[in-house]
């Protein structure tokens, strides 16, 4: 791993611009702090974008898809062929994220990193690393070479996004079994017990959750030597799409593009990214707090302040996309409101 590009520092925050944005917020015609998180969001974006007038109009949504060998252990409520079927749905416009992308005027980048059955689908970028990952209860989910290729795939999507002037990047995922993989990665990175982070995923009942937990515990025992190591945990227990998301978040920070993180699986990728390169944390916004029980713990670990709490558990980047209108409105409020002086409104006495 001589070319460890992910260790390159993130772009620096423009502190003077952030301070100028904070000063502007204090002059707008409202009680100081009354717009709460929206104010903080606008100030944060000003510092990250280095702009007096922050914006989130140019939106890129990348959906990374891959299958998981651990599905053979019965950890998902859905059959594996759904992953490939959903690729059709994404590009045909019928998926939730497809609808949201249209409504938000976003560029949708759908990437097949390794579904079980190869497909020649127009509108899908085929960067196949393998026919799904290996079953991580028998050995590593990925080889090092496959893991590095998946990281690079995420980075490549960000570079494509940067080339068209993207202001906000969303990563989404599709892969039956990927909540099991994400839970296993997070448990390994955080060195915590599986029941803390294992949940129903796409709809397991209580018995299914118990079984899924036991499968993950077997995998954690097998790969115990890598506990606490973010990269090895990712490669041994993760999926192609989780690794691609990790690479995307790292690249966003390095290229100066703000990323909006989606739900549980994306937050696990964000956790790995931050553990690999702590400087990338400033460039991550968090769209929502999802229904998966472990998501709350991850958000607390990442000291994240999600914008929405709607009980979502879909994935695909959908929760992050739903938060985009709030980001855009935060920018519009910051940019468009009058100051007390401009509106000839009396400010609160000092």
Swiss-Prot record:
It is an enzyme of class 2 (transferase). Its EC number is 2.4.2.21. SUPFAM superfamilies: Nicotinate mononucleotide:5,6-dimethylbenzimidazole phosphoribosyltransferase (CobT). The active site is at residue 316. It catalyses: 5,6-dimethylbenzimidazole + nicotinate beta-D-ribonucleotide = alpha-ribazole 5'-phosphate + nicotinate + H(+). Keywords: Cobalamin biosynthesis, Glycosyltransferase, Transferase. GO terms for molecular function: nicotinate-nucleotide-dimethylbenzimidazole phosphoribosyltransferase activity. Disulfide bonds: none annotated. GO terms for biological process: cobalamin biosynthetic process. Pfam families: DBI_PRT (PF02277). The keyword Glycosyltransferase applies. InterPro entries: Nict_dMeBzImd_PRibTrfase (IPR003200), Nict_dMeBzImd_PRibTrfase_bact (IPR017846), Nict_dMeBzImd_PRibTrfase_N (IPR023195), Nict_dMeBzImd_PRibTrfase_sf (IPR036087). Pathway: Nucleoside biosynthesis; alpha-ribazole biosynthesis; alpha-ribazole from 5,6-dimethylbenzimidazole: step 1/2. The keyword Amino-acid biosynthesis does not apply. Transmembrane segments: none annotated. Catalyzes the synthesis of alpha-ribazole-5'-phosphate from nicotinate mononucleotide (NAMN) and 5,6-dimethylbenzimidazole (DMB). Belongs to the CobT family. PANTHER family: NICOTINATE-NUCLEOTIDE--DIMETHYLBENZIMIDAZOLE PHOSPHORIBOSYLTRANSFERASE. NCBIfam families: cobT_DBIPRT (TIGR03160), PRK00105.1 (NF000996). This is Nicotinate-nucleotide--dimethylbenzimidazole phosphoribosyltransferase. It comes from Pseudomonas syringae pv. tomato (strain ATCC BAA-871 / DC3000). The lineage of its organism: Bacteria, Pseudomonadati, Pseudomonadota, Gammaproteobacteria, Pseudomonadales.
């Amino acid at each position: 791993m001589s070319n460890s590009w992910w260790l390159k520092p993130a772009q620096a925050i423009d502190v003077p611009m952030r301070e100028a944005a904070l000063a502007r917020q204090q002059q707008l015609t409202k009680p100081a702090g009354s717009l709460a998180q929206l104010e903080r969001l606008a100030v944060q974006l000003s510092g990250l974008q280095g702009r007096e007038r922050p914006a989130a109009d140019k939106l890129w949504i990348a959906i990374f898809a891959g299958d998981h060998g651990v599905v053979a252990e019965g950890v998902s409520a859905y059959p594996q062929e759904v992953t490939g079927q959903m690729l059709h749905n994404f590009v045909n416009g019928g998926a939730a994220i497809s609808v949201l992308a249209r409504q938000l005027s976003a560029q949708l980048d759908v990437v097949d990193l390794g579904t079980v059955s190869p497909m020649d689908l127009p509108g899908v970028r085929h960067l196949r690393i393998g026919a799904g990952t290996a079953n991580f209860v028998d050995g590593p989910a990925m080889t090092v070479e496959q893991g590095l290729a998946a990281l690079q795939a995420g980075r490549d999507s960000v570079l494509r996004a940067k080339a068209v002037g993207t202001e906000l990047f969303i990563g989404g995922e599709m892969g039956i079994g990927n909540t099991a993989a994400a839970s296993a990665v997070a448990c390994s990175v955080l060195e915590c017990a599986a029941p803390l982070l294992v949940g129903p995923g796409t709809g397991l009942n209580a018995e299914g959750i118990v079984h899924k937990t036991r499968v993950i515990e077997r995998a954690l025992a097998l790969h115990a030597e890598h506990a606490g190591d973010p990269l090895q945990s990712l490669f041994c227990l993760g999926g192609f799409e989780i690794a691609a998301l990790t690479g995307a978040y790292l690249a966003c920070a390095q290229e100066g593009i703000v990323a909006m993180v989606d739900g549980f699986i994306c937050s696990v990728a964000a956790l790995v990214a931050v553990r690999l390169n702590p400087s990338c944390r400033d460039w991550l916004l968090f769209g929502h707090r999802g229904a998966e029980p472990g998501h709350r713990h991850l958000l607390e670990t990442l000291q994240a302040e999600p914008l929405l709490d709607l009980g979502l558990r879909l994935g695909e980047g959908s929760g992050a996309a739903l938060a985009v209108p709030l980001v855009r409105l935060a920018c519009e409020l910051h940019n468009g409101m009058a100051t007390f002086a401009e509106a000839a409104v009396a400010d609160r006495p000092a």
